[in-house]
């Protein structure tokens, strides 16, 4: 059974924990409480299997605290990560600049493929959720961008997250198959 490690990173108060709980069908948190360090959620998704074999997959979703005081822990969090989801609050202009640092640190410096990274513009309840005017600078503008609004259209982000998980698992499966072929030949 394949096991994938996915990091949820991004600025403070961007909605990482709320989104992580929703996507893993964990408990709801009603009041804001900053994540201290990391919170690991383990889950399986029946819609995601390894290739056509129907083999199940396990996931670890690492909900990482957004405070820079945890920066010394980041190398340990990044170890053996298969994917990174950068969550930001689209209604806070400074977050657009901050996600460049998150991308550089968690994707570029780890030599993670861009296809293993997804941006989530999280719109908090009552924010209106304007999806049109996000000016992302290169190389962020090449990444998969998903808007999440759990109040108005919760299933959109769930569907996109499942597609993302499938792409991670397919990549892991192909890599494992290549390694097995090298052993055989």
Curated annotation (Swiss-Prot):
Domain of life per record: Eukaryota
Keyword annotations: Cell projection, Cilium, GTP-binding, Nucleotide-binding, Phosphoprotein
Annotated positions binding GTP: 10-17, 63-67, 123-126
InterPro entries given in the database record: P-loop_NTPase (IPR027417)
Residue numbers bearing the Phosphoserine modification: 137
Pfam families the UniProt entry points to: Roc (PF08477)
GO molecular function terms attached to this record: GTP binding; GTPase activity
Cell compartment(s), UniProt: Cell projection, Cilium
GO CC entries: centrosome; cilium; endomembrane system; intraciliary transport particle B
Any one of the GO BP annotations: intracellular protein transport
Major localization class: other
Assembly description: Component of the IFT complex B, at least composed of IFT20, IFT22, IFT25, IFT27, IFT46, IFT52, TRAF3IP1/IFT54, IFT57, IFT74, IFT80, IFT81, and IFT88. Interacts with IFT88. Interacts with CFAP61.
Known role: Small GTPase-like component of the intraflagellar transport (IFT) complex B.
Protein family according to the UniProt entry: Belongs to the small GTPase superfamily. Rab family.
Protein's UniProt name: Intraflagellar transport protein 22 homolog
Gene: Ift22
